[in-house]
Amino acid sequence: MRVLVNKHVFMQPQPGHYAHTRMSMLLLKPKTKDLLSHRLDDVFRSASREADALAAARYREPERGAPTGFNLAFNTDKNFWEYITNDDPQRGERFARAMHAVNINSLDVIPRLYPFDSLVVDGGLIVDVGGGQGQVAKRILEYFPSSGLRCIVQDRYVVNASSPGPAVVEMQQHDFFEAQPVKGAAAYFFRHIFHDWPDKACAAILKQTARAMDKDRSRILICDQVLQDDVPAEASLLYDIDMMSLFGGKERSLAEWKYLIASAEESLHIVNVIFSTESEAAILDVRIK
């Protein structure tokens, strides 16, 4: 307790007595508690072995499937997602709750970040690739209730997406490293997907998506961070370490995004980048030349 008082987590109004501070009161909120537990148990443990993972990769960007700090810390050859889905679902549930405590993951930001209703002129079909249970897709449909938008949510592990509310999405099992089965959609939407993977893996995902696009009406919408070139925010830099330790991925600057997209498919290019004023999120609008 003395250490925690010194760090202003608790206060000591008199000898032998301790009291809450604004900081300790945050720990009473379940989502904040889950976030702290995730960072201490998942991220810090993984980061403690990241130097070993980098040494094994000879200090080069890891290939898809190369051991990460997470693999070494948890003694598993499964990636983070496979592990929390199959081996430790309680850890996965905690991770999902923790992500709701982080501002960048606020679902309310996404519909305000891009004029999704404008996609109706190109058919109005949004494919949410790697979209989990469809939370984001449903929020978009609820934000534009009379627009005529439709959403297909793809994920490797399909779950029941039913939830209260009028928005209905179609669920489809799909591995985004395989050929994209939905052709010519107005938008292929990727939220927090690419920062989980190294460049070569991301390029493979983009190639499969580009092959399914219609040159005139399709676009790829990437919702991720875009690191500032001068002095990136501290939170963004910490996310960068998180991605490397857990997944072998990374956050990217605009120059790195441009390089990645051009290296994946020559015909793809970024036409616009929209930055959120509410969080670190951004949307990159990618089209075929």
UniProtKB/Swiss-Prot annotation:
Transmembrane segments: none annotated. It comes from the Eukaryota. Keywords: Methyltransferase, S-adenosyl-L-methionine, Transferase. One of its GO terms (biological process) is methylation. InterPro entries: COMT-like, O_MeTrfase_dom, SAM-dependent_MTases_sf. Pathway: Secondary metabolite biosynthesis; Alkaloid biosynthesis; Mycotoxin biosynthesis. Belongs to the class I-like SAM-binding methyltransferase superfamily. Cation-independent O-methyltransferase family. This is O-methyltransferase asqN. The gene is asqN.
